[in-house]
A protein has these predicted regions:
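A charged, amphipathic alpha-helical module
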Residues: 8, 16, 20-117, 243, ...
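C-terminal regions of proteins
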Residues: 406, 449, 453, 459-505
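Proline-aspartate-enriched helix->loop->beta-strand connector
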Residues: 192, 422, 426-432
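Gly/Ser/Thr-rich loops at beta-strand to alpha-helix junctions
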Residues: 118-127, 198-205, 347-354, 436-443
Length: 507
């Protein structure tokens, strides 16, 4: 019998992982509740008003269930790394949410705190504004759009339908459609002295920025990022854009960029990047210690939200020490899944509405995801020796942003990098997400299949619609994998209870 009830996905009881791991997991679960309760009690009246003002606020009430789904049946080092990362996310995000609501002019009209905030597109890492310590940077779409779409699969549906009712085509990528819907419904917090937009990750996001810009009604700087970002002849332009962005922020805030503080922040980011690359190196071994959806979710968070954050860096150091320990002691990490049949590379953008897909495919079919495309971003080491070299490194980091690091830049980053990762991680299976609303990658489907055949690599296609569970459900995604594993691979599941179930009403 599955731990979760059909349809709702509510757990019948907590996952049993053995005495030691169960107690640890329960302790971290209580720690999460402590973070959430502490956040709620700091501004109880304001938070209640926010729940009634913003539809997306309700999704944050389900965070404990979301974290439980991501941990799956993990134990040992993987469980500890997962829980530590997730609680770090909760700690940092609740602080940003508090700063946002305290400054929100929708909740407190004429709020003077609003002008102390730099509003910025979620695809731009906070490192860009690290030299402006008198102001707070808030990633505009992250709190009302991106994070709720991970936490609760139903959260985006209302806003996507609002966009379509307004006249946007139904085949638009759900990411810009969701953001446009939030703007139409006026559900973005009203904060900021200025707004930094960008042309990432795709053309759809550029178009939805125009709708957001109308709603924000703030002085706006469009930070334009070269599409051919791997070419050296585009870097002069990228650096000039970065300089212009910093000058714009100085003009709007009245604060001069502190280059010494920016340098310190860049050096912290460099250490974070080195620690991330160490995790990749551990995953290339025969016994990768850390897999699951929490890996790529934490990477997106640490690149955008948590870059240069001392709290995040301290967590990275602790997590890496835990993951290194079994190798230093000459033993294998905790076995997850219980039987490893395949080492897989996941390519293309994963489905937000099924963030724990990696846990399911591991526990049902023994597929160990050792490399996620969405995890491979922003690890450019920044040369801090001069201001110019620092700006160059900062520009390169921004260009290697979430999703677009592989979906923009040409054949070499979307196609050649895939085969390089298959070789590096010694993968025998590719899980290829077919994001049906993404027109760019869809054009390469035949090329992917042809090159996989030439190399003798198995490839399972999994159709999904990113943030819209009404188009392709979690169950439909699982069915595609089930059919492939049973008919093409001729395999039987590790756990038959996980093959087919209904979680249509689950968060």
């Amino acid at each position: 019998m599955r731990l979760e009830k059909d349809k709702t996905g509510i757990a019948r009881h907590r996952q049993w992982r053995g005495l030691k791991d169960t107690l640890y997991d329960y302790g971290q679960w209580l720690k999460l509740w402590g973070i959430l309760i502490k956040w709620a009690l700091r501004h109880p009246v304001l938070n209640v008003r926010a729940v009634f003002r913003y539809r997306w606020m309700l999704s944050y009430l389900t965070v404990p269930s979301f974290f439980d789904r991501l941990t799956g049946r993990m134990g040992g080092e993987g469980l500890r790394a997962c829980r530590m990362n997730l609680n770090t996310v909760a700690d940092v995000v609740t602080k940003d949410l508090e700063k946002t609501l305290v400054a929100d002019e929708h909740l407190r009209p004429g709020n003077p705190n609003s002008k102390k905030i730099i509003y910025m597109d979620e695809l731009i890492p906070k490192l860009v504004t690290a030299g402006f310590s008198d102001h707070v940077t808030i990633l505009a779409q992250a709190i009302p759009a991106y994070l709720p779409s991970l936490i609760n699969q139903h959260s985006p549906v209302h806003y996507i339908e609002a966009s379509e009712s307004y006249g946007l085509p139904a085949d638009v990528c759900p990411l810009p459609s969701l953001e446009a819907g939030i703007a139409i419904e006026d559900d973005f917090p009203k904060v900021g002295c200025c707004f930094i937009s960008c042309n990432m990750p795709c053309d759809g996001s550029i178009m939805t920025t125009t709708m957001q810009d109308r709603r924000f009604n703030l002085p706006t700087f469009p930070l334009n990022i070269p599409l051919r970002w791997t070419r050296e002849d585009t870097q002069e332009y990228a650096v000039e854009e970065m300089k212009a962005c910093i000058a714009f922020i100085e003009e709007q805030t009245g604060e001069k960029c502190d280059w010494d503080k920016l340098k310190e922040a860049c050096e912290r980011v460099n250490e974070q990047s080195r620690l991330k690359m160490e995790k990749w190196e551990l995953n290339r071994t025969d016994t990768p210690p850390f897999i699951g959806g929490s890996s790529w979710i934490y990477r997106i968070f640490s690149y955008e939200f948590g870059c240069a954050n001392p709290r995040v860096l301290a967590n990275d150091r602790k997590v890496n020490a835990i993951l290194r320990k079994p190798f230093e002691e000459g033993r294998a990490p905790y076995p997850y899944p219980k039987e490893v049949r395949h080492r897989a590379v996941v390519w293309n953008t994963p489905a937000n509405m099924y963030a724990h897909f990696n846990a399911w495919i591991a526990e049902c079919w023994g597929v160990q995801v050792v490399c996620d495309m969405i995890d491979l971003q922003g690890t450019q080491i920044i040369d801090t020796s001069t201001r110019e070299s620092m700006l160059y490194g900062l520009a390169k980091m921004v260009q290697g942003s979430t999703m677009r690091v592989h979906t923009k830049g040409g054949w070499e980053v979307i196609m050649n990098d895939l085969w390089a990762k298959v070789e590096e991680y010694r993968a025998d299976l590719i899980v290829m997400f077919d994001q049906i609303s993404c027109k760019g990658v869809a054009a390469l489907k035949g090329a992917f299949e042809e090159q996989a055949r030439e190399r003798g690599i198995r490839m399972v296609w999994v159709e999904q619609d990113l943030m819209d569970p009404t188009t392709i459900s979690r169950r439909t995604m699982r069915d595609q994998v089930n059919q492939y594993m049973q008919t093409v691979m001729g395999e039987t599941p590790l756990d038959a209870d996980l093959v087919d179930f209904d979680d249509s009403e689950a968060w």
